[in-house]
Amino acid sequence: MKKGISLVLAALMAVSLVACGGGSAAKSTTAAASEQTEKQTEKAGETEAKKEETKGEAKTIGVSLLNSTHVFYNSIQTAMEEQAKEYGWTLDVQDAAGDANKQLGQVQDFITKKVDAIVIAPTNSAGSKSMIELAEKAGIPVFTMDIASDGKPVTHVATDNKKGGQLAAEYVVNNILTEKKGNAAVITYSEIESCVDRETGFTDYLKENAPDIKVVDVQNYSGDQQKAADVMQNMLLKNDNIDVVFCVGDPAAIGALSSITAANAATKIIGYDGNPEGVAEIKKGGNWVADVAQDPAGIGKTTLEAIKKHLEGEKVDSEILIAPYIIDAKNAK
């Protein structure tokens, strides 16, 4: 009997020990989970505090524009200045005047000044890669706009340029060479990737959708309006007939128009930018019949918004594309 009671007591003690052991493990797990939650909450609090601190800080942004004399870049700059004012930021805007060496010097100066971010509208897609790398080594984020770089900025904000070229080609097919036969030419800007994208969008669309509209000539104007006039003159002399010329920028279209007018040619022009000069010519009802319009103000504003998000720790897309649209006699204002 005593032996039986002893066995029962031993069993009860064993159960008691197991129960205590289980309770101890549960308590330990709960404590660890609680500690982990506290750490996560603390870390999240630090992140939010850092974001709030960043939001309250005044920032200085260095901006190097391709060419400040271009109406398109004037509009970008104005939009950026308005957005910066809203944020309480300072913009240090410099004009590269189409000179890659000058732009490099401006970026180096921004680095010396320890600006919070740098924006580049590259004078040259390949050459801007080294500028981005220099800034990154200094811990300064770089953003590009309008013209893409061969480097890797935080984000690139621009018009969807291939789509823009496609819109120009669609306009040719639907409004100029409606029988899908004829000759087209392109005045391009081969040093600038965004302009090459416009050319590609145009020529690819015609190849796929109107193969009997032949692109008989493609020449580079290198961003020089007078050279565009010379190029157009050369095209008219070389080719028996050019029904339409697609110009990858309005300065090229202005140059082309002067040569077409001088030759009394019937060649139609489609420009690209949507600048006031182009719109004015379209309203006259002459050779310049359409323009692919960009949204420079949208590009400027969106670039500043992307910088703000990045500086506050938010993720931004590597590329932000803004849709272009066609201006012709129907909607020219």
Model-derived features: where do they sit?
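Positively charged n-region of N-terminal signal peptides that target proteins for export
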Residues: 1-11
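A residue-level marker of the well-folded mature domains of exported/periplasmic proteins
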Residues: 13, 17-333
